Regions:
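Hydrophobic transmembrane alpha-helices and immediately adjacent juxtamembrane helices
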Residues: 1-264
Length: 264
């Protein structure tokens, strides 16, 4: 456990050092964060235009919560970058084992994702005139954290595709996030989709967690909310298992044939 905590700590230090080469706190706050707030605002106003106040709240809540997924899946870029700059083999030979190091490579995005979603949760509803039932709405915070964790596992699993097929990391990232945003109940209920698609989206992160957030806001029974949280946790665990298997096979194959080398 101590070694895992050390890896988490050092991964965060490395991740934020990497981010500091791109962002200052000002450019992150007034550039990236404002961009995310504008994105959520755009969809909320679009919901108001095509519907009513209830539609606007539905869309706003969905787009605030999904920001956590957006940032968590950026781990795809972080992991693909290790291959591009030639450091992937070094991660594979770490004394603590390659899996914790790989899974920790993008942890900084979980911190920024949680920050972005919570800032949006507190700022956008009053600014846009969308009332939330405070203090009950505060219970959404730990649910967003769970969604963030399951989305990070989803991103780690899909990073395996980007590590095997060089140059596709941005395509993988945008498809991963776009699929969740389109079919995961963010802007329209999952029930609008055909039955086979409704079944398929249950394996995506966000779907059950977002339903739990909506249930909290609507005063749903605690048992109903807890079942949804359990489903979200199960989905996240499944994606972490896929990520672990994918990375194990990647490293095993790379050790045999030397394919972990520099991307060129």
């Amino acid at each position: 456990m101590r070694s895992v905590l050390r890896i988490v700590r050092e991964s965060l230090i490395l991740g934020f050092a990497e981010m500091s080469a791109v962002y200052t706190w000002r450019t992150w706050t007034f550039g990236w964060l404002v961009r995310l707030l504008c994105q959520a605002t755009f969809y909320a106003l679009l919901g108001r235009y095509v519907g009513d106040g209830a539609t606007m709240r539905y869309v706003l809540v969905g787009n605030i919560v999904v920001l956590a997924c957006l940032e968590a899946t950026i781990v795809v870029i972080s992991l693909a970058g290790e291959r591009r700059i030639g450091t992937l083999p070094l991660l594979a030979i770490t004394p603590s084992g390659h899996l914790p190091v790989y899974l920790g490579r993008g942890l900084q995005w979980t911190v920024t994702g949680l920050t972005s979603s919570l800032v949006a949760w507190c700022v956008l509803p009053p600014v846009l005139g969308v009332p939330l039932p405070w203090p009950r709405a505060a219970y959404a915070a730990p649910v967003i954290l769970l969604i963030l964790a399951s989305s990070y596992g989803y991103g780690c699993a899909l990073a395996g595709v980007a590590l095997r097929t060089r140059g596709v990391e941005w395509l993988v990232l945008n498809l991963a996030y776009g699929i969740v945003m389109t079919f995961g109940g963010v802007n329209v209920p999952v029930t609008v989709w055909p039955a086979p698609l409704r079944i398929a989206v249950n394996v995506l992160p966000v779907v059950h967690g977002l339903q739990a957030v909506r249930g909290i806001l609507d005063g749903a029974p605690p048992g109903h909310v807890l079942r949804l949280l359990g489903a979200e946790a199960l989905v996240g665990a499944g994606w972490y298992a896929v990520a672990a298997l994918s990375m194990e096979r990647l490293v095993s194959a790379g050790r045999r044939d030397g394919s972990l080398g520099h991307a060129g």
